[in-house]
């Protein structure tokens, strides 16, 4: 669950 949230933030930053 924590990993999924991290990936979502990465997409917003990109």
Curated annotation (Swiss-Prot):
It comes from the Eukaryota. Its main location: plastid. It is found in: Plastid, Chloroplast thylakoid. GO terms for cellular component: chloroplast thylakoid. The keyword Chloroplast applies. Keywords: Chloroplast, Plastid, Thylakoid. On the 2D-gel the determined pI of this protein is: 5.7, its MW is: 28.0 kDa. This is Unknown protein from spot 118 of 2D-PAGE of thylakoid.
